[in-house]
């Protein structure tokens, strides 16, 4: 599947805020956004008046970059969200949150969604006892995600177990036990991404 392969730190600078795409590095002085908190390029420090379309576009780009998704797949998520009952913008964020790579990240495996995606691709996880190596796989309520037995003994997963994260309300389990469960679909208040999904819906609705 296609993915962005350029300079990650430029994405945060372009959006004007930290997207925490590099995990722990984003909390250190090495963070490029902390050192140069303006847009990249020759005219990055100049201030421009942003149109309504520009604001909508920036929100879409921000969401794509947070979840590591390119345009074609992102539009597919929007179209699916629009077909579902309920609020389209919230449906969109819920679909993104229920991706396996994001759930793995939320459970504490990986310092970033990029690392979590790599772990999924390399076949480290089981969903309901079956190996799944597709990052975009949509998990469902009551699904159980476990680490493969062979992977539990690796230094990487031992490190994750020693540094557990606080889980969101819609997930349960513990990283030390190498298991997590999707208790329910996330509500909007459970999704802590700095995105105004209404602007994204307005953009695609034109």
Swiss-Prot record:
InterPro entries assigned: Ribosomal_uS4 (IPR022801), Ribosomal_uS4_bac-type (IPR005709), Ribosomal_uS4_CS (IPR018079), Ribosomal_uS4_N (IPR001912), S4_RNA-bd (IPR002942), S4_RNA-bd_sf (IPR036986)
Ranges for domain S4 RNA-binding: 98-164
GO cellular component, one term: small ribosomal subunit
Gene3D superfamilies: Ribosomal Protein S4 Delta 41, Chain A, domain 1, RNA-binding S4 domain
Keywords for the protein's UniProt record, in alphabetical order: Ribonucleoprotein, Ribosomal protein, RNA-binding, rRNA-binding
GO MF terms held by the record: rRNA binding; structural constituent of ribosome
Top-level taxon of the source organism: Bacteria
GO biological process: ribosomal small subunit biogenesis; translation
Protein family: Belongs to the universal ribosomal protein uS4 family.
Subunit organization: Part of the 30S ribosomal subunit. Contacts protein S5. The interaction surface between S4 and S5 is involved in control of translational fidelity.
Annotated HAMAP family: Ribosomal_uS4_B
Function of the protein: One of the primary rRNA binding proteins, it binds directly to 16S rRNA where it nucleates assembly of the body of the 30S subunit.
Protein name: Small ribosomal subunit protein uS4A
Organism: Clostridium botulinum (strain Hall / ATCC 3502 / NCTC 13319 / Type A)
Lineage: Bacteria, Bacillati, Bacillota, Clostridia, Eubacteriales
């Amino acid at each position: 599947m296609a993915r962005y392969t350029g300079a990650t730190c430029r994405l945060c600078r372009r959006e004007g805020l930290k997207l925490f795409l590099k995990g722990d590095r984003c909390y250190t002085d090495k963070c490029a956004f902390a050192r140069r908190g303006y847009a990249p390029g020759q005219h990055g420090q100049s201030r421009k008046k942003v149109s309504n379309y520009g604001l909508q576009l920036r929100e879409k780009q921000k969401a794509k970059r947070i979840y590591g998704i390119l345009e074609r797949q992102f539009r597919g998520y929007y179209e699916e969200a629009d077909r579902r009952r309920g609020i389209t913008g919230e449906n969109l964020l819920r679909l993104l949150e229920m991706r396996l790579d994001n759930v793995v990240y939320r459970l504490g495996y990986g310092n970033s969604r990029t690392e979590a995606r790599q772990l999924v691709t390399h076949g480290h996880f089981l969903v309901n006892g079956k190996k799944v190596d597709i990052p975009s796989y949509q998990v469902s309520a009551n699904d159980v995600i476990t680490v493969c037995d062979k992977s539990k003994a690796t230094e990487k997963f031992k490190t994750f177990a020693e540094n557990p994260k606080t889980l969101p309300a819609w997930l349960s389990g513990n990283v030390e036990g190498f298991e997590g469960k999707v208790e329910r679909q996330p509500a909007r208040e459970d999704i802590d991404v700095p995105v105004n999904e209404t602007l994204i819906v307005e953009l695609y609705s034109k």
